[in-house]
Amino acid sequence: MSTSRTAEITRNTNETQIRVAINIDGTGQQKLNTGVPFLDHMLDQIARHGLIDLDIEAKGDLHIDAHHTVEDVGITLGQAFAKAIGDKKGIRRYGHSYVPLDEALSRVVIDFSGRPGLEFHVPFTRSMIGAFDVDLTREFFQGFVNHALVSMHIDNLRGANAHHQCETVFKAFGRALRMAIELDPRSAGTIPSTKGSL
């Protein structure tokens, strides 16, 4: 590969200080320290199932709650993806995945369209997974979508265990990302759009 598809983004606000480094042609290596253990567990799923190297450090106002940290990690990760992918020449653009975990099944479909949009349909069976507020799952993905400039549909098709529901969503997200950002050797470096740009 002639150019490295990597990026490092730093985001500093009064609420959070975040650094994200990614290699989207990686092997799934990860170094995660967000201060939110369940978020680290979910980010690990993205790295492993997307074969994306992730190095994420975050310090946030966790004395209030995890909202700003989770949302801002999503924002910064989205910015890093946008930078690493660049002009999108040669990528497959679309990705999708179904992932089961015992009784739970989730589907994620993504389009690196340049137009942000999120359809999020996850009927969590409880409001908390340990100390993690399940509402923050949507906040993470909304932040990612808005800053990676992607259209994404996330559906939990069935599930009784909220941890399983959330984990299948993140695993499917990782696998859908992997498909969408993969370089297609047959496209000869063209942009996958009739408009000529994304």
Curated annotation (Swiss-Prot):
It holds the Pfam family IGPD. It is an enzyme of class 4 (lyase). It is found in: Cytoplasm. Its main location: cytoplasm. One of its GO terms (cellular component) is cytoplasm. GO terms for molecular function: imidazoleglycerol-phosphate dehydratase activity. CDD domains: IGPD. This is Imidazoleglycerol-phosphate dehydratase. It comes from Herminiimonas arsenicoxydans. The lineage of its organism: Bacteria, Pseudomonadati, Pseudomonadota, Betaproteobacteria, Burkholderiales.
